[in-house]
Structure formats: structure tokens, C-alpha cells
Amino acid sequence: MGVLSRTPTPIDADRPAAADLLRVVAAWAVATFHIWQQSWFSLGSDHWQRAGSIGVDLLVMLSAFCLFLPWANARQRGEPLPSCRPADFYRRRAARLLPAYYANLLASFLIALKRHGWNRALGLDLAAHLTLTQQLFPRSYIGTLLNGVTWTLTVFALFYLVFPLLAPLCAKHPLPTVGALCLVQAGYSQWALHQYGTGEYALLFNQFPAFCGVLAVGMAAALIFAELAHGSWTVRFAPRAACTALGVAAFVWLDRCMRLQAWAAEYQQFQLINRMPLALAAAAMLVCFGLGLTLPRPVRRVLSWLAALSYSFYLWHQMLAVFLKYDLHLPAWSGDTPPNQLGDTAWMRQAHALYWTAAIAVTLAAYYGVEKPIAKRLHGKKG
């Protein structure tokens, strides 16, 4: 029984493989963008390289989907809603995010200390990062001396802060809750767009309110998926195959959103305008593939493994590329101008290969040396 079976494998309503697929695609897109920034090596998919930074938007939507899915399933099955005591929820989220993050932050701090020496600015930067508030202060956000990609953790932390309130509200009153979140993003985005062209806009367009609608899309996608995943139609091949085809169509839509973003004349301005279409395309892809034909078990296992690595990979890839290029001058170069800016295509190719290899190697070391052992200790998990 598998992807070509006339009697499809039952839908996994609790952990759809489509969520792992989207997580891997989003993490790859972000890394493709950051490594391309350093190497300038073209993969032939220029729009994904140029617009890959908005993979963050996909990760935000996906986080809302995955966290809310147990609530959506309980609502659909008529079961009691999951317990969500804030203290327990915050403890679980901290155990999931902080060990790998603090290990990465230590490395980032040591690199910054070597580059700049100890000073008050670095101390304040470190304090903001330790408390996950780095995005709230310009010096520790766009002016950080530490790992620049971790601003997203402020967005996630603020979402986790309100999730124990949002989850029961959305389960009991989905339309008003989703609508209110979308209105928050729409109102904030309109205000922020009026700041475009000023120095303030760069600080505004990725703040938490600018993602509230994206979070709403993720929670709505969980409700739709849960509603459809338990129907009698799921045992029939034709509708499941049709869902897979719709998932492919949604990916084409997502790819078009990426193309529009990549070639936008005003990239950051359009990023805020394009955020909801992008989130909707990704959510459609997530739901349709989740309801579609089940992937073979070996493929699902590989996707699950890659998805498990994605957090450490996200934390390490960009700072490693910058460290190798500017601190170690690898691949070897001299002078004040990096070879990619001089059109050295051989160096670009070598840099691209080196930065990806280093990111994957350090990700494996961080995951198996830090993230997984600590998770086993904190959660009592095996294997």
C-alpha cells in the first residue's frame, strides 16, 4: 500500500508527512538565499535563491498549523480539547527551542568576541538574545553582532506566549478568532507600508503583528485538514489522487509567489504585500498533499529525519557561511574585495559547495551532539 495503491493508506491526521515536506522546503529556501548571498553561485532556480528568505513566512504558518492540529482534531472528533496550562506549554516549548539555540548563541558570541572584543553593545546584544527579545531592539535586530537569523525566534516566542489563549478561542470560535488575527495583520501592514522609504520600515515589516494573519492561515488550515481527513471519502483512490494533483497546483501557485517576490522592484515593500498570498499557497499545498496519496514509508522516514534536522540547520547555516568567508577566508582569497564580487565563477562554485557541506556537517553534529541528547533527557524519549 502506498502512493500508487488503489486502496490508499489511511491519512495520518495527527502528523501528516506534508508538514515535514513543507518544513524541509522552507528551511532549504532560507538556506539557499543566505548561501547565495555569500557565494553568488546560481543553481538555475534564481527566484528561489533571491526570494528564499520568505521561507521564514512558511515556517511561521507551519508552526501554527502543527501546534493547533491537536486542537483541530479534538474539535472534529468531539473529544475534550487538549489541556493547555500556560506553565506546562511554555516549559515544553522552552525545552524544544532553547538548548540548540543557546548552543548556537554561545558559538555566535565567541565569534563576535573575537571580532569586536567585549563592549557594552555586545553585552546588550547578548542580553536581548538570551531573552529572545532581540527583534524588539534595533541594535540586536538589524544591527546585531550575533547570529542574524535568530530574530525569527522573537516572533515564535510571542506566538507561544499567546497560544494558550488563542488555541481554545480558535477551537470554540474559529471564524472570529481567525478574522481578528487577519485584521491585526492587515491593519498593521497598512500602517507599516506607509513608513516605507523611511529608516523605520526595515524594523517594522517582520514584527509579530505582521505575521498574525499568517498564523491565522496556519490555524485555519489545521481546522480544514482535520475536518476533511476523517471523512469516508479518504478510502477511495480517485479523490485522494485529486488532492495530490491539487497539491501540485498549489505548489505551482507558491512558485509563482516566489517569482513575483524575487523580481519585485521594491523587495521589502512587496514582501509585506505578498505575505498572505504566499501563506495561503503554502497552506493549500500543505492541506492538499496531507489529504492526498500517502508517500511510501521510506520516503516518509527520510522527510521526518530531514524535518528533525531543520531547526539546527536553520540556526547554523548562515553564520557558518559568513564565518568561513570573512573570518577564515575560505575558499582561499585575499585582498579587500571577495572573489564573488570580482566575477570569479570558480570561487563561487567552490564557496557554494563548501558552505553547504559545512552547514550540513555542523547541523548533524549539533543535532546528534546537542539537540537530540538534551531532548531525550528532558522528555524521556528513546531512539
Tell where the protein language model's regions lie, with residue ranges.
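Alpha-helical transmembrane segments in multi-pass integral membrane proteins
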Residues: 2-18, 32-52, 68-84, 138-141, ...
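Residues within membrane-spanning alpha-helices of integral membrane proteins
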Residues: 20, 24-27, 56-57, 63, ...
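Conserved beta-strand->loop/alpha-helix structural units within folded catalytic cores of enzymes
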Residues: 21-27, 63, 93, 99-102, ...
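Small-polar-interrupted transmembrane alpha-helices in polytopic inner-membrane proteins
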Residues: 25-34, 174-194, 243-252
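Membrane-embedded alpha-helical transmembrane segments of multi-pass integral membrane proteins
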Residues: 26-29, 33-36, 62-65, 128, ...
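Generic alpha-helical transmembrane segments of integral inner-membrane proteins
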Residues: 28, 102, 106-110, 114, ...
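Membrane-interface helix-loop-helix regions
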Residues: 70, 83-91, 97-155, 186-202, ...
